Amino acid sequence: MQERFAETEFSHAMVPLAVGNLTFRNRILVPAHTTNFGVNHLPSERHLAYHRERARGGVGAIIFESIRVHANSLGRPQAVCGFDPACIEPFRKITDAVKAEGARILGQIIHLGRQVEGDFERTVSFGPSPIPWATSALPPRPMDRADMDAVIEGHVLTARHLVAAGFEGIELQMAHGHLLQQFLSPLSNTRDDAYGGSAENRMRFPLEVLQAVRAEVGRDFCLGIRLSGDEYVEGGITIDQAEETAAALAAAEKIDFFNVSHSAYHASYSLASQMADMAIDPEPFRSLPARIRIALRDEGHDIPVFAVCRFNTLAEADAIIAAGGADAVGMARAHLAEPAIVNKTVEGRMNEIRTCIACNQGCAGMLEKNLPIRCLVNPRAGLEGEWAELAATGAQQPKRLLVIGGGPAGLEAARTAAERGHIVTLWEKHQNLGGQFRDAIKMPKRAEFRTLMEEQIADLGRFGVTVVTGKHADAGSIADFAADAVFLATGSIPVRAELAGGGKAFTIVEALDDPAALGSDVALFDRTGEWAALTLAEHLADLGKKVTFFSPAGGIAWRTTIYSTLANLKRLREKKVRIATLRKVTAFDGKILTVEDLSTGESELHMGFTGLVAAEHNFADQSLFQQLRHLDVPVRQIGDNLAPRTALEAVYHGHLAARDL
């Protein structure tokens, strides 16, 4: 058994914190994050199981996700409302469960403003001014006095319901480009009345909301603000302005905490930074809470300030608190990946932690599709009420399992089955485990996949999996092994584009392995819309090559999240990668590239390219599966062997297969 860390190891993060009338047992919190678990706009049993498990994992406080204050702020079927009294009873179940585990429970209340175009509820969206959040969006209705009063009343009513439901605190959402931030920002507020123009005027409506909620909940109830420290868009809120806003709000009304984030819902890098993926360095964002904390104290306001954005470990959280950069740290995605990260760290069980890698595939990626959030590294995320923890699912009759293939799916299946008590052997034809993870980590800005790969491999040893590398599997060797069950995780086969002209089209992997063979001027044709082509383009540009990115679609990266796409576009633009959409490469003879303009049907001839990379979807490798049909042993295909998809699906199906065994 591993030795428990003394709390002095995390002497800043693991000490209590007074926040208004509350005391958090430690300074780690789960900040508000949308889950899409709502049912009929009410909190669900799925919410209950999800938050109870994270409270049980040792966190100091949980802030429940964006609770809508008005019907025209719902936006999606799974959004949770607070203005309907029907929310009180299901919320009470959640608050009781979280408090029973020793954590504090707060709720964030929100109006989304112009982000909601009203398609779902057939309502009119509100905003300070008729300025859409993106070129593809619709302008909101500029709010009049009656609209403002309705939104204030919605905040007050929601606060009343949350207090009745047992919430111990409320956070007003003035960040991330939602309605109250839209009033604060000169980018979205161009009014010429008392609610626009000067900083004081732009703050007027958010302050009215704050004062109305404070009057409803009373002076002794914990009430705080989530604030963007910087919008990261020209003409928007800067950190200097955010400092002034925080100090002015604190001078005007009692505020018990500031939760400092950044960004706005703006179709630019601003939005990309909001859920910064593994390609984005989080360090610049971590200066924002420190700046606001200093500004508040300079004005005599000793108010706790929370920091957020890609804190993956308690050590990182402890360091920023120790340095005076924040009083507490929010770790949303880290808790999605590992609900017990606090307890496991303090108890010295670091090798059991599933570390967030900021891939954003299961969290942001699912939100964009209006689906419940998931997690690549934690397939159980969001299924806490349906899937018991593995420790409680021990095999009644251990089976002898043979897993063939040591990529994302095979590694997950092997470690999960072994943890449940099965006798597991894994064969891998290569000398190294990892499969497509090993290709991914060659890419710039994708190296954090190594963390997951190494954690999976370490678990093979921890749970006693027998690993044989350099092992070729065929029907005979599998039959001789005499397993009780076989999982095929042999992956997929790269497809080489068939083009006229006779010139070679490199695959993504070939280009990664031998970029010099492409020469200095590279054409990259992507049919997949996935990460690999994007990161290869950036990698080749980093090597000093001229890169032209051809896409048959109207844009690029249609299968990555908008957050990541916007960040990628910024980097590709900075590295002078040329992007040509609605273009299909039809021929290459080594010198002349023929491209069809899909908008006109005409062909274009491009001279000077020294190499071509064609990104195609892989095909499942079915060859071994066909050989095993005659075996009197259950054979289950998992990962890309079942169907080529993302690592999110590969890991999930590997985990699911092991649970089903």
Spans of features found by a protein language model:
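Flavin-dependent oxidoreductase catalytic cores
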Residues: 1-404, 408, 412, 416-419, ...
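Short beta-alpha connecting loops at secondary-structure transitions
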Residues: 272-278, 327-328, 437-445, 636-643
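Rossmann-like dinucleotide/flavin-binding elements
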Residues: 395-427, 433, 468-480, 489-560, ...
